[in-house]
């Protein structure tokens, strides 16, 4: 019987198999969008279990768990045992068939943890134990995994207010992978968010040393942070914009909008 998600998964023809195994699989990875925190790389973190490796800070996995009715305490609660959190994730997986996460999770189980069984509530303990054995190996650290995966460049997602201290620490640690920040400016673009005022005044404004009250101030603050990021090697702006709306207005109208949200003085 063919093994579940074997080395030829999605490679349905001989040509596809040859192109991948003889060429693509050997090429270095340039990852332009990663959710790995640079601190984990700088400290060469060793993950104790799959809950730490998968569920500590992965919003895509969290969204699926929420959609399956898992409580927020179980998903993000710091007091929830890792094994319990992983069980909830495993019980959700059979319902995720057709979602890219189903393929991603099982490909990782196969490639990094040598586990080839479909993840479910019934197989959770078996997968947990097998992954634990794999994670205990000397090279299964944050930098070790990047090295074995041939990741040449990795770009993290970073808010414009980030001081990028951990990117500097990665360089000092001598990591073989080049780790660069990306300018993730979502918080600056979501003016409808109730926290936008505080973000602009106390987060972005303070980070850029700009007293924000007009649209020109917003631009100046973002430009300063862009310059700071660029000095640390950033070359990518990564924004989640569902649709682009355009309406031509005068500069004073933009100032009114910003003023209304920042200090209640706009009209």
Where are each of the predicted segments found?
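Metal-cofactor-binding active-site regions of metalloenzymes
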Residues: 1-267
């Amino acid at each position: 019987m063919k093994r579940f998600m074997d080395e030829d998964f999605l490679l349905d023809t001989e040509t596809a198999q040859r192109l991948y195994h003889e060429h693509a699989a050997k090429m270095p990875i340039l990852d332009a969008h990663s959710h790995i925190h640079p601190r984990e790389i700088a400290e060469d973190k060793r993950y104790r279990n799959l809950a730490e490796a998968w569920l500590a800070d992965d919003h895509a996995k969290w969204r699926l768990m929420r959609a399956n009715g898992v409580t927020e305490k179980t998903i993000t609660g710091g007091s929830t045992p890792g094994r319990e959190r992983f069980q909830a994730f495993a019980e959700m997986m059979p319902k995720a068939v057709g979602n890219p996460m189903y393929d991603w999770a099982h490909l990782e189980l196969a490639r990094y943890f040598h586990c080839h069984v479909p993840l479910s509530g019934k197989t959770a303990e078996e997968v947990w134990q097998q992954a634990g054995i794999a994670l205990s190996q000397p090279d299964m650290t944050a930098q070790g995994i990047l090295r074995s995966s041939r990741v040449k460049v990795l770009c993290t997602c970073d808010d414009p207010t980030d001081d990028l201290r951990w990117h500097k620490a990665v360089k000092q640690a001598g990591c073989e992978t080049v780790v660069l920040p990306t300018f993730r400016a979502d918080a600056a673009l979501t003016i409808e968010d109730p926290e936008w005022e505080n973000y602009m005044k106390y987060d972005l404004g303070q980070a850029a040393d700009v007293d924000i009250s007009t649209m020109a101030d917003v631009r100046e603050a973002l430009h300063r942070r862009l310059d700071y990021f660029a000095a640390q090697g950033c070359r990518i702006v990564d924004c989640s914009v569902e649709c682009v709306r355009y309406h031509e207005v005068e500069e004073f109208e933009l100032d009114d909008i910003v003023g209304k949200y920042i200090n209640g003085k706009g009209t």
